[in-house]
Amino acid sequence: MTAQNPNLAALSAAGVSVWLDDLSRDRLRSGNLQELIDTKCVVGVTTNPSIFQKAFAEGHAYDSQIAELAARGADVDATIRTVTTDDVRNACDVLTREWENSDGVDGRVSIEVDPRLAGDTDKTIAQAVELWKIVDRPNLFIKIPATQAGLPAITAVLAEGISVNVTLIFSVERYRAVMDAYLAGMEKAREAGHDLSKIHSVASFFVSRVDTEIDKRLEKIGGERALALRGQAGVANARLAYAAYQEVFEGGQRYQALKADGARVQRPLWASTGVKNPDYSDTLYVTELVAPNTVNTMPEKTIDAVADHGVIRGDTVTGTGPDAQRVFDELAAVGVDLPDVFVVLENEGVEKFVDSWTELMEETQKQLGSASK
């Protein structure tokens, strides 16, 4: 058996599931995904519109399937749906062993609803159900954004017995609403007679984008006190989120009642963990966010950085809430408008995915056009 990288093995042993934030047909065909499972402790995959847009734009792995779909008269939406769900289904199959070995906790692959639906609850629910049926794998996660319209969709989709990855969470306040939506969904699933032990969920809390936005504002404010806070907000925010998770799932009565009927915790997932600022350690959002019952989904570059020089020191999150709160108190004191930061980040997050989806549609249209000539 191939040996696992010791740094990533230490991360896994500390309770962090390592997931790959990427997927492409080339990665599946070459056996690279299986190799990462065997050597880099990868036990899950996340995708998003930007990842698929990049996969479509690079190389020719999709050419023959798109030509076949063009010959059948498939439109752009149908083509994207077929191609992306095929990749996700194949990735689910590659990760079946990890899914079985973890009793369904890991071995998960996430596919996102069309980001253009982020403001439409009913259409989000309908597409989530449709994607679940098309992929037809028990280790699938449907990604739903934590927008105001997304929250009731999360509850409704979980109530159908469908596992959900809640994405685009930036603030602890919104994260609390997400946990509430999860518990409401599980209560409804119980009423409907679903086996709660088979319904899983993660809450994807974005990290590096918080630093990018807040650092920009700190530089504008200027002065020693403000500048000293750069690079601290992302980790502090995630640590406060973990404290909220512990409050709800380790001490909360509402969850305990569901747990008695087999419900799992909704694990926090650290997303956007690739470091954007070259002044910071490229493993910052991994080594500083080690905690039991968490997931860290990373681009391959970050996985490689952790494998090469990541120092895993055990749990770096539990008990850090008061220090993290001090960072936020200080940010407010120097004049950072935190509520505005989180509104901007959510809007930008949705816009980025919509832009990627638009590019994906344009690329697909171009390929369908070429194939039908």
From Swiss-Prot:
A GO BP entry: pentose-phosphate shunt
CDD domains, sorted: Transaldolase_like (cd00955)
InterPro entries (UniProt xref): Aldolase_TIM, TAL/FSA, Transaldolase_2, Transaldolase_AS
One Pfam family per UniProt: TAL_FSA
GO MF assignments: transaldolase activity
Catalyses which reaction(s): D-sedoheptulose 7-phosphate + D-glyceraldehyde 3-phosphate = D-erythrose 4-phosphate + beta-D-fructose 6-phosphate
Record key words, sorted: Cytoplasm, Pentose shunt, Schiff base, Transferase
Any single Gene Ontology cellular-component annotation: cytoplasm
Cellular localization per UniProt: Cytoplasm
Residue positions of the active site: 143
Superkingdom classification of source: Bacteria
Signal peptide boundaries: none
Protein's UniProt keywords contain Cytoplasm: yes
SUPFAM superfamilies hit by this protein: Aldolase (SSF51569)
HAMAP family on file: Transaldolase_2 (MF_00493)
Name of the featured protein: Transaldolase
Organism whose genome encodes this protein: Mycolicibacterium paratuberculosis (strain ATCC BAA-968 / K-10)
Gene it is expressed from: tal
